[in-house]
């Protein structure tokens, strides 16, 4: 039962801007049990697959465009690479150090509140100027910096990158697509690097399926909420989660 519940938590919170790491802390406190690292990594692969399904059209267009030497898609792929650089550097060299300092529940609560602020501000941004192929290199790097912040427990990866993209004037639907295209290597890497010597059990498979299905649901829900300008509701939720973490965990 706990494995299934963790699959639901991972599938939804990996994509909804409420911080999967913050909710992992809540899960750990409620059940007084830290989830197995290998199992959590396996769930990352489920959410990776969910993203691939969600942006399959864009992935095909980019790959096809690169092979056809279409400058627009070659440039887009390079910008996505630029966006991945900050998270890669932080993840490789500083992740363990950062988490060792900021893994206390007080900090998790504070960072959840910051994610909430991001969501409230995101709803007020409606420039809708840039499509996914018109994002400048500098903007791509800035969005990448915000993605790197998500190494802090309680900072939502999707929330921070959406906030940055909308702040920089990217169209809402394109901000969602770009956020999840640039997340693919991060999610896949998180799964593969920590799955070494993991024995996959029947319970793991059940959790994988649940995480995949709830991940698909979470992706479509987020897209609708962004377009409808209702990210503030995620912000309110983050504030409540922040208070719960600070005062009850």
From Swiss-Prot:
GO terms for molecular function: undecaprenyl-diphosphatase activity. InterPro entries: UppP (IPR003824). It is found in: Cell membrane. GO terms for cellular component: plasma membrane. The chain crosses the membrane at residues 11-31, 35-55, 74-94, 101-121, 135-155, 175-195, 208-228, 229-249. It is an enzyme of class 3 (hydrolase). It comes from the Archaea. It catalyses: di-trans,octa-cis-undecaprenyl diphosphate + H2O = di-trans,octa-cis-undecaprenyl phosphate + phosphate + H(+). Its EC number is 3.6.1.27. It is a multi-pass membrane protein. Keywords: Cell membrane, Hydrolase, Membrane, Transmembrane, Transmembrane helix. Belongs to the UppP family. Catalyzes the dephosphorylation of undecaprenyl diphosphate (UPP). PANTHER family: UNDECAPRENYL-DIPHOSPHATASE. This is Undecaprenyl-diphosphatase. The gene is uppP.
């Amino acid at each position: 039962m706990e494995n299934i519940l963790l699959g639901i938590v991972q599938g939804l919170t990996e994509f909804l801007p409420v911080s999967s790491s913050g909710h992992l802390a809540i899960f750990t406190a409620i059940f007084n049990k830290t989830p197995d690292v290998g199992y959590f990594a396996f769930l990352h692969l489920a959410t990776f697959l969910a993203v691939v399904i969600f942006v399959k059209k864009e992935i095909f267009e980019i790959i096809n465009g690169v092979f056809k030497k279409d400058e627009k898609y070659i440039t887009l792929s390079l910008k996505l690479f630029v966006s991945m650089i900050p998270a890669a550097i932080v993840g490789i060299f500083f992740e363990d150090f950062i988490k060792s300092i900021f893994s206390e529940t007080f900090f998790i609560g504070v960072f959840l509140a910051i994610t909430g602020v991001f969501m409230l501000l995101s709803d007020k941004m409606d420039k809708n100027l840039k499509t996914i192929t018109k994002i400048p290199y500098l903007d791509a790097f800035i969005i990448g910096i915000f993605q790197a912040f998500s190494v802090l427990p309680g900072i939502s990866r999707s929330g921070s990158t959406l906030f940055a993209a909308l702040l920089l004037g990217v169209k809402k639907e394109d901000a969602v697509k770009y956020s999840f295209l640039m997340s693919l290597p991060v999610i896949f890497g998180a799964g593969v690097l920590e799955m070494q010597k993991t024995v996959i059990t029947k319970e793991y498979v059940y959790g994988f399926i649940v995480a995949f299905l709830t991940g698909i649901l979470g992706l479509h829900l987020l897209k609708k909420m962004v377009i409808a300008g209702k990210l503030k509701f995620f912000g309110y939720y983050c504030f409540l989660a922040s208070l719960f973490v600070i005062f009850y965990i």
